[in-house]
């Protein structure tokens, strides 16, 4: 999508990696992102305690800061079991979104000055860990992953959906445990099967989220490259 303003974002990463003899390798990195999101309305919402407060921006076309700080690390080594790869990454920051989505809008055209387009500034936290274990010299690998995304770290549980808080299901945290396997037929074709156990934060004040939703997912994919 083309840019709709002249403001520039900054993104950078500092990283290092090093081999450990002929059997292992490690790496680590720090990343930073700083940018802005266009607000097409005269209103915006920011957290104060455990609720959103509406701000009168006075005009359309203001901007809300978007900022991420990230850390990542990886370690791989060879053993009698085969190659083991461990990776972890964490991200915190501020993410402007709308009432119905914590993702920042990606506008190709300027949206209208409508209430549903007002920005909500949310402090977020996300992280994941994954393990890939090759099974000896066989073409099979096992995969295990755990990830968490909390789109609004200022509220939890029954605080979400409380009267006059302007919070909704968008502010509920999610976590996933994934297990699967990869079978490499050759260097070009591989088959992957992956099952995700999805868990959502619960709130008695958000319809449909009083309990954990039944939304586990099985994915089977044949890839050619």
Language-model features, listed with the residues they occupy:
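Outer-membrane beta-barrel pore domains
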Residues: 22-225
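Aromatic- and glycine-enriched pocket-lining scaffold segments that form the walls
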Residues: 1-37
């Amino acid at each position: 999508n083309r840019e709709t303003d002249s403001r520039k974002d900054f993104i950078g990463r500092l990283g290092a990696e090093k081999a450990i003899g002929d059997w292992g390798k490690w790496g680590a990195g720090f990343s930073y992102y700083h940018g802005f999101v266009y607000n097409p309305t005269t209103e915006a919402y920011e957290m104060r305690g455990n609720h959103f407060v509406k701000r009168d921006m006075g005009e359309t076309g203001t901007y809300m800061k978007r900022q991420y700080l990230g850390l990542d690390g990886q370690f791989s080594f060879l053993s009698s079991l085969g190659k083991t790869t461990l990776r972890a990454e964490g991200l915190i920051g501020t993410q402007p979104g709308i009432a119905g989505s914590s993702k920042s809008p990606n506008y190709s055209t300027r949206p209208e000055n409508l209430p549903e387009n007002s920005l909500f500034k949310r402090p977020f936290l996300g992280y994941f860990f994954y393990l890939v274990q090759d099974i000896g010299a066989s073409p099979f690998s096992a995969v295990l992953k755990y990830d968490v995304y909390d789109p609004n770290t200022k509220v939890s549980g029954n605080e979400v959906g409380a009267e006059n808080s302007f919070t909704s299901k968008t502010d509920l945290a999610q976590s996933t445990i994934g297990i699967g396997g990869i079978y490499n037929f050759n260097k070009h074709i591989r088959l992957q099967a992956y099952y995700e156990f999805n868990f959502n934060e619960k709130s008695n004040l958000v319809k449909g989220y009083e309990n954990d939703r039944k939304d586990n997912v099985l994915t089977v994919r044949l890839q050619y490259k």
